[in-house]
């Protein structure tokens, strides 16, 4: 059984405890919390921090549950890098952050390196052609970026 006084933390940040998403009671608590916000505040969606480390099974169930709560409910995930289509698909998230493009826009503009911007936009357009219409919902500039 493990230490009853200890817990796992996200990347060693103990103010961010890891939730046991394999536990059905924990999952249901999260779904009930979202239902509360939908019922009382008519929210249209949520943003999942660090979606790239969340269990895909959980995100699939989250998509199913939130779509039942509100058909147009929006799920957006923070994904730093990778094959974004692993997260953006009809079973999981509607969109993800796109820090790769944000970096190209930010540094390319500041350094007057417009080749960097053009290269990254062309690269994303090539990927987008394969995954349209899902990819088009990708956030073009990341959030929480200084």
Residue ranges with predicted function:
Residues 22, 78, 100, 135-138:
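Structured loops at beta-to-helix junctions and adjacent beta-edge loops in soluble globular domains
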Residues 1-21, 35:
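Aromatic- and acidic-residue-enriched carbohydrate-binding clefts of CAZyme catalytic domains
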Residues 41-42, 134:
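Short loop/turn motifs at secondary-structure junctions
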Residues 22-40:
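Short, acidic/polar
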């Amino acid at each position: 059984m493990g230490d009853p006084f200890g817990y796992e933390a996200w990347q060693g940040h103990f103010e961010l405890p890891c939730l046991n998403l394999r536990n059905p009671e924990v999952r249901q608590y999260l779904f009930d919390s979202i239902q509360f916000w939908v019922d009382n505040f008519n929210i249209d969606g949520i943003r999942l921090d660090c979606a790239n480390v969340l269990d895909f099974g959980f995100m699939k169930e989250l998509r199913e549950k939130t779509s039942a709560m509100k058909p147009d409910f929006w799920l957006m995930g923070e994904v730093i890098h990778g094959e974004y289509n692993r997260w953006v698909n009809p079973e999981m998230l509607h969109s993800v952050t796109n820090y790769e493009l944000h970096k190209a826009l930010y540094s390319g503009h500041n350094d007057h390196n417009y080749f960097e911007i053009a290269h990254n936009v062309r690269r994303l357009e090539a990927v987008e052609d394969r995954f349209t219409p899902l990819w088009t919902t990708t956030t073009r500039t990341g959030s929480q970026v200084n």
